[in-house]
Amino acid sequence: MQDLEFSTYHQPVLAPAVLEALQPKAGGLYLDATVGGGGHTALLLRREPTCRVLAIDQDPMALAAAQEFLAPFGDRVQFWHGNFADLPVAEPMFDGILADLGVSSAQLDRPERGFSFRFDAPLDMRMNPANPLTAATVINHYSEQELADIFYEYGEERFARRIARQIVARRPLNRTQELAQLVAHCLKASPRQRIHPATRVFQALRIYVNQELAVLDQFLARSPHWLKPTGRIAVISFHSLEDRRVKQAWRANPLLEVVTRKPIVADAVEVSLNPRSRSAKLRIAVRTSA
């Protein structure tokens, strides 16, 4: 089945640290708020044979792959399709919560999803295909000022205005590599650059299309209320916009005691085996007894 590509691609980042963070216990109930390929959920279920996991994802292809990958665990894992900020939970019920933020390797490696400039594909970038807004709509219909604001706010792109001006002059742009080449030309980038010059623009578009930061803010506000007293929450972020939000929200929340003064990062061995882990940052907090 093609959707199993999600499972084969999903090497769970910071696996030992996640297990140490959540400390799965006998009979515990855990929330994997971004199940993706199912790697982290499988870790929890294998570590503690009597714990259970509610696994959710807004990407129906990822969820279908996770359901098949995790089928051997039977009814110890339940699935819910939707955004983690919209989970209908009204009371403390989880012993631990995990959120692995951002786009997965499987999503990046599927050309038709339009997340990556490594492939020539339609500018899509929707994590949930039911979302009516695509990256192409943003690129081709938003004003120069709106585009510049998106690139600066969500990509921290210092040449946002220059790039937006060129996009408006050259559009329509409907393909990933069209946009990537325009940005590279606009910035007069050297082919020897380690990071592609369009990286920040693509990040900004993906975050905007999926409203990732607004959704994360909702999750950070609601999720502490879903934890039982002494329950643990772990969030893996992949860029400073996410990490900053996690740090500030937890510090300001009286329901949480922050465990990690500084985020946990991957060591050189993990980075060599799983390059996606290079930018991963793990923060941990514990629900107080209040």
Curated annotation (Swiss-Prot):
Belongs to the methyltransferase superfamily. RsmH family. One of its GO terms (biological process) is rRNA base methylation. This is Ribosomal RNA small subunit methyltransferase H. One of its GO terms (molecular function) is rRNA (cytosine-N4-)-methyltransferase activity. The gene is rsmH. HAMAP family: 16SrRNA_methyltr_H. Its main location: cytoplasm. InterPro entries: RsmH (IPR002903), SAM-dep_MeTrfase_MraW_recog (IPR023397), SAM-dependent_MTases_sf (IPR029063). The lineage of its organism: Bacteria, Bacillati, Cyanobacteriota, Cyanophyceae, Acaryochloridales. It is found in: Cytoplasm. It catalyses: cytidine(1402) in 16S rRNA + S-adenosyl-L-methionine = N(4)-methylcytidine(1402) in 16S rRNA + S-adenosyl-L-homocysteine + H(+). Specifically methylates the N4 position of cytidine in position 1402 (C1402) of 16S rRNA. It is an enzyme of class 2 (transferase). S-adenosyl-L-methionine binds at residues 38-40, 57, 84, 100, 107. It comes from Thermosynechococcus vestitus (strain NIES-2133 / IAM M-273 / BP-1). Keywords: Cytoplasm, Methyltransferase, rRNA processing, S-adenosyl-L-methionine, Transferase. GO terms for cellular component: cytoplasm. Its EC number is 2.1.1.199.
